[in-house]
């Protein structure tokens, strides 16, 4: 398989490894990006965790709580200037209220519903906002959580909504505990609540990478397994909420903080504006020329 410059660029962005190392890794793995990442890690040429996807699109997250239901949404626009616009913020609020009340299953379904059950469709309301504000605006995603009277939501918006986290805790009605967990999730970005949620396939893959790393370091086989288990603990700390040191008190784990409050984390949803979206790249010289020609 031909290795393209774009493939090398993507691998470099994800691993931080050198260009020639990335090219060799792709050649060795027949162009498979995921295998190439493992190859680089086994050789000690890449960081243990992939770099986060480049965040490019603008917009805000918003959280709407109504009784025992709460919705977290992400709405995108083209520039961060628009996120400070009162009309854009009002649109966020209206969309949040609609979604928490109507619980559409998909974005497509939400767009076809009448806003608040009457009048214009959600899609038309967004289209009208585009005409007034002058930028493309889109409802990207949302999730609705439900609780009982004995549970608590935790809502946290970082930097006005560039990151939004909605948590759901059982066994407590203390919203501050929920917010503390939401703040931690915003800061540390775990992927799972408990170890049990991590797929066995993912754990086994990590174990193999760590084992190869240890052997490549020249460690004796009789201590490799112990080393691997030790490093697996760090792997779980990186991705599992309850295994992490609590950001507001690093001397204790999140697990202990929650247990001391008589609570349990049921779930959380974390949205970071634009994650996984690629911004259009333009050559700076070409951009200048295009402005001159106007």
Curated annotation (Swiss-Prot):
Residues 79-82 are annotated as: Involved in Mg(2+) ion dislocation from EF-Tu. This is Elongation factor Ts. SUPFAM superfamilies: Elongation factor Ts (EF-Ts), dimerisation domain, UBA-like. It holds the Pfam family EF_TS. It is found in: Cytoplasm. GO terms for molecular function: translation elongation factor activity. Associates with the EF-Tu.GDP complex and induces the exchange of GDP to GTP. It remains bound to the aminoacyl-tRNA.EF-Tu.GTP complex up to the GTP hydrolysis stage on the ribosome. Belongs to the EF-Ts family. The gene is tsf. Keywords: Cytoplasm, Elongation factor, Protein biosynthesis. HAMAP family: EF_Ts. One of its GO terms (cellular component) is cytoplasm.
